[in-house]
Amino acid sequence: MDAPVPAAPAFGGSWAKLNPPLSPWILDVINSMGFKNMTPVQAGTIPRAVKNQDCVVEAVTGSGKTLAFTIPVLERLSRREEPYKKGEIAAIVVAPTRELATQIHAVFHHFLSSLIPPESEEETGDVEAHAPPFASSSRSPSPQTPDKPLFPLPMLVTSGTPTPYETFQSTHPSILIGTPGRLAAFLLNPRGLAIVRVSELDVLVLDEADRLLSSPDHRRDVERIMRHLPKQRRTHLFSATMTDAVEEMIGLGLRNPVRIVVNLKDKRKDGEEPKERRTPMALQNTYLVCRHAEKTLQLIRLLLCESTKHERSKFIVYFSTCAAVDYFYRILSRLPSLSKFHLTSFHGELPPKIRETALSTFTSHPSSHLSPAVLLCTDVAARGVDFLDIDVVIQYDAPTDPKTFSHRAGRTARAGRRGKAVVLLGKGREEDYVGTFQSANAELMKRKRQKAQRSILDFLNIRKIPLTKQPYINAYLEEVDTPQALDPEATTLLHSIRQIILTDRELSDKAAKSFVSAFRAYSKHEASFIFRTLDFDFNSQAISFGLLRLPAMPEIKDWKKKKEAERQRLEKIKSEGGEVEEKEIIEWEDAGVNWDTFAYASRQREAARLATLAQRADNQSSNDAARAEARAKRKIKAEMREAWSEQKERKVRKEERKEKKDAKKKYEWELEQANGEGDRQSDLANIAKAQAERKKRREREEESWDEEIGKEYKSLKREIKEEKSVKESSKGGAGGGGIGGGMFDDLE
């Protein structure tokens, strides 16, 4: 590989200074978009990409990478002497997500649609007006001039593209943009092999290459596409971060590539070494430390503080899982304190059409500080999707993959705008995520480094992502130090969320699901030496999620055992006069809920739940009867295994107990009569008579009971003997060696 290209200046210069110069029609479109000057990544990439060079481009998010590959593709297409024939492909752009592919398609479409003459636009206006933003459109043939050639519009190949082969045959696009799986299926399907010709392909672009190659499925599809394409092509890789997988792909799929790295450096005083960074210079990157129980409270206060005090109007909030996004969207949208906010849910498990609608609703919302817009999402919106007007990014959960941190934060402070990013971190060990103790006691820092094998501190500083501390926000939206005890408002918020959940059992199900999924994501964090499951406080997290009760998880059961063992250990140390470091204990109490009557708001789901309860009750009664019969069988089997002498002794002991009981009652009665008055002899006769009657009555009851029980006993005993004989016969049949094994069965 060639030596890295020197970093471009802060401003890449005028578009007119490019060498070789761009076509006039491309410059016209750029000027109409309002871009007066190039960014450094554009100035470094476009001249080399227009020529016959493969490019590997690493630049911070929001630096203009999309135009850096769009313009060279169009310029090479415009300079080609022989136009492409129908069915031939000039360029393919691969993006990891549908949203990013749609955005890239819109940029290509904007350039190429500018070549359609006004009269042609009027003829096809009705078609274009009703066409979806991802669909390619055909156009009427019009005369072209050297200044304004005519090219077919690009085609988007994603999960939302209807009838792709019909669209391809009707529009004959020269440029395909799509996701890896859909593109691979489109190109390598027998029908695609027949109608899509790639022998003349000129350029392949891999946008967000690190994400494309980090996913096994994406990587497999990308490799299939690359094997299908001609080797004599230009290949460009673009990303904000470079990984080992990207480096491997550079060696396999590129020819003599040039590496273009655009760095940002903080300004320093004279004599100080400037520090590199991987986030935009206009970004205020911060972190806020709180207890896990206070995270939702701090999220709400951040939204209120930034919108009211700083007049921010557009926010993105990142969660680690789709279940958490779905749950918090339903809860936060019903909190009175956030009634003025317009919330949108966006994650990968939504159907493509709903995702598209959600994204469109958020971007088009006329937000202001009086009516802010908030997008609750997962990392599906962390890369490539270009939000030009995001004011604040809040990371409720630190990303599982630390490389995603810069991509999340980079959704704001784009195209020269200022922006703010905040990540919420748990109090304690999670503070090491940003090197909180770097300026603390040097000796303490040294011991911590040795204990954690010199790897836990300054995690993001090592990754060239500088952060500053965001103070805790109190109930008056004032910035203060993190409170020593749990914020009382956290408990108040817990009760408010519980009141919302109690309106629909489905919310309780979603709360439990999101809680479990959040812990699973926490346990899979790549920085597991910082985000340790051993330090995870389930009680604290449950308060933040507003749960009615802790879910049945084996991890919680083990955690409670360890917690109790630790408590007993500390109490023992205290009783022996030792000193114990007091640790904060956050208590948890389940909500008082009658789970049998707690209903779903949906009539269908509630009817299904009640039917399940009834079925469970029937099964319970039948199970109780089966268990009683099993107990009786076990008792009979035990008696059958007893010796005859033991059975006789047991009966004798039973009779002795009865006689002792009668003698005791007689003695008690005689004692009462000795203290009273009356005819002694008459009373004794009455006693003997009553005693004889009781004995006869008991004998009759025992006879009837013995008769009933005896029948059941004999029936069970007969059943046990039959089971035993069946087992013995099956054993004999399996053995096949002795007389009982059926050796002479055929001699009759």
Swiss-Prot record:
Keywords: ATP-binding, Coiled coil, Helicase, Hydrolase, Nucleotide-binding, Nucleus, Ribosome biogenesis, RNA-binding, rRNA processing. Residues 295-460 form the Helicase C-terminal domain. Residues 732-748 have a biased composition (Gly residues). Its main location: nucleus. PANTHER family: RNA HELICASE. A motif (Q motif) lies at residues 15-43. It is an enzyme of class 3 (hydrolase). It comes from Cryptococcus neoformans var. neoformans serotype D (strain B-3501A) (Filobasidiella neoformans). Residues 143-152 have a biased composition (Pro residues). Residues 119-156, 614-748 are annotated as: Disordered. Residues 132-142 have a biased composition (Low complexity). ATP-binding RNA helicase involved in the biogenesis of 60S ribosomal subunits. Binds 90S pre-ribosomal particles and dissociates from pre-60S ribosomal particles after processing of 27SB pre-rRNA. Required for the normal formation of 18S rRNA through the processing of pre-rRNAs at sites A0, A1 and A2, and the normal formation of 25S and 5.8S rRNAs through the processing of pre-rRNAs at sites C1 and C2. GO terms for cellular component: 90S preribosome; nucleolus; nucleoplasm; preribosome, large subunit precursor. ATP binds at A59, V60, T61, G62, S63, G64, K65, T66. InterPro entries: DEAD/DEAH_box_helicase_dom, Helicase_ATP-bd, Helicase_C-like, P-loop_NTPase, RNA-helicase_DEAD-box_CS, RNA_helicase_DEAD_Q_motif, SPB4-like_CTE. This is ATP-dependent rRNA helicase SPB4. Component of pre-60S ribosomal complexes. CDD domains: DEADc_DDX55, SF2_C_DEAD. The Q motif is unique to and characteristic of the DEAD box family of RNA helicases and controls ATP binding and hydrolysis. Its EC number is 3.6.4.13. Residues 46-260 form the Helicase ATP-binding domain. It is found in: Nucleus, Nucleolus. One of its GO terms (biological process) is assembly of large subunit precursor of preribosome. One of its GO terms (molecular function) is ATP hydrolysis activity.
